[in-house]
Amino acid sequence: MKGENVFISPASISSVLTILYYGANGSTAEQLSKYVETEENTDKVSAQNISFKSINKVYGRYSAVFKDFFLGKIGDKFQTVDFTDCRTIDAINKCVDIFTEGKINPLLDEPLSPSN
């Protein structure tokens, strides 16, 4: 990824691991369970009066098959889309723009290639 910036957010990684945990089973779920948030940790942060704003959306390719348990756990955070369609990119950018109150716009400049 020469010449590209990469931003890694620990909070985002934690959120994604939690979402993946709900979609996993067996030894994968067991391994992921070591890294997901617990109510005990969340209560400690709340007690310190810390504010953090986060949005999580999971977009999956419309032709992929997803487990019902996974879909039930993440609910409205999940949407199937066509990543090569400009309307998908517009919808993702609009969601991010509204949530960040215009601070991040656009997030994506062009449709995503399925091979990337």
Curated annotation (Swiss-Prot):
- SUPFAM superfamilies with a match to the protein in the record: Serpins
Q: Which residues form a coiled coil?
A: none
Which Gene3D superfamilies does UniProt cross-reference here?
Answer: Antithrombin, subunit I, domain 2, Helix hairpin bin
Task: Show the GO MF annotations.
Answer: serine-type endopeptidase inhibitor activity
The record's listing under InterPro entries reads: Serpin_dom, Serpin_fam, Serpin_sf, Serpin_sf_1
Q: Which GO terms describe its cellular component?
A: extracellular space
What family does this belong to? Belongs to the serpin family. Poxviruses subfamily.
Classification via PANTHER family = GH10112P-RELATED, SERINE PROTEASE INHIBITOR, SERPIN
Q: What is this protein called?
A: Putative serine proteinase inhibitor 2 homolog first part
Protein species of origin:
Vaccinia virus (strain Copenhagen)
